[in-house]
Curated annotation (Swiss-Prot):
Assigned protein family: Belongs to the cyclin family. Cyclin G subfamily.
UniProt subcellular location: Nucleus
Official protein name in the record: Cyclin-G1
Chief location bin: nucleus
This protein's encoding gene: CCNG1
Keywords, in A-Z order: Cell cycle, Cell division, Cyclin, Mitosis, Nucleus
The species this protein was found in: Sus scrofa
Function noted in UniProt: May play a role in growth regulation. Is associated with G2/M phase arrest in response to DNA damage. May be an intermediate by which p53 mediates its role as an inhibitor of cellular proliferation.
Amino acid sequence: MIEVPTTTDSQKLLHQLNALLEQESRCQPKVCGLRLIESAHDNGLRMTARLRDFEVKDLLSLTQFFGFDTETFSLAVNLLDRFLSKMKVQPKHLGCVGLSCFYLAVKSLEEERNVPLATDLIRISQYRFTVSDLMRMEKIVLEKVCWKVKATTAFQFLQLYYSLLQESLPYERRNSLNFERLEAQLKACYCRIIFSKAKPSVLALSIIALEIQALKCVELAEGAECLQKHSKINGRDLTFWQELVSKCLTEYSSNKCSKPNVQKLKWIVSGRTARQLKHSYYRITHLPTIPEMVP
């Protein structure tokens, strides 16, 4: 079995990984609160898993529309789930809560010149609440997450695990694992509330391990096993979440799954609004399907 690589670059990556592992239990959604949402009946008065998942898909559409980083989307989902797992949110307020979490994540991680005006964000999102409503909700969200906006996410682990696996491979084999595909798979998982109950490290490694199984690459499998041991991830936990990820991705690739739609956003931007928006705001990108594996 290969060992965790010991080059200078890999040592830096391991240091980052150890820091994330030490921090990952902080600033995560309350599992008991998420379970209450999952068990709620869809009567129009209570928050449900279906409503939460639709809201996350809308946030993913906005992420694609503005060309924001996946880490911004990941943090927005983290903030949303942390808030929903603590508070009894009425469905009519979910849009404002979701957009507030998204805006907090954008302002926290994106370059200032790329942060849209609140008025533009509300208009493009097709909501009827005001900027004042959004600002008030932002303050409420901040108070409920104890003003701790930054959090450890599965995307951060996905990046680190991928980089460490790349370090363990010969140069000519480093194209065997496609990060864009892994990233797309993680986005699909974020759109299901059940994966917010998984530890970020476990979710990230589950996605990678499942992909490695399909690739049938011994070196990558050995590398993933090393990462599992280093991260102290229980084998049963990993298998449990791998099975759920596999089921999610199968459904996501079928026609039965409702995918995020950025096309609907572009029709509500008038010519005048488009001229007023920064050029980078108006890059409409289709949500890509999960890339095929290269044989």
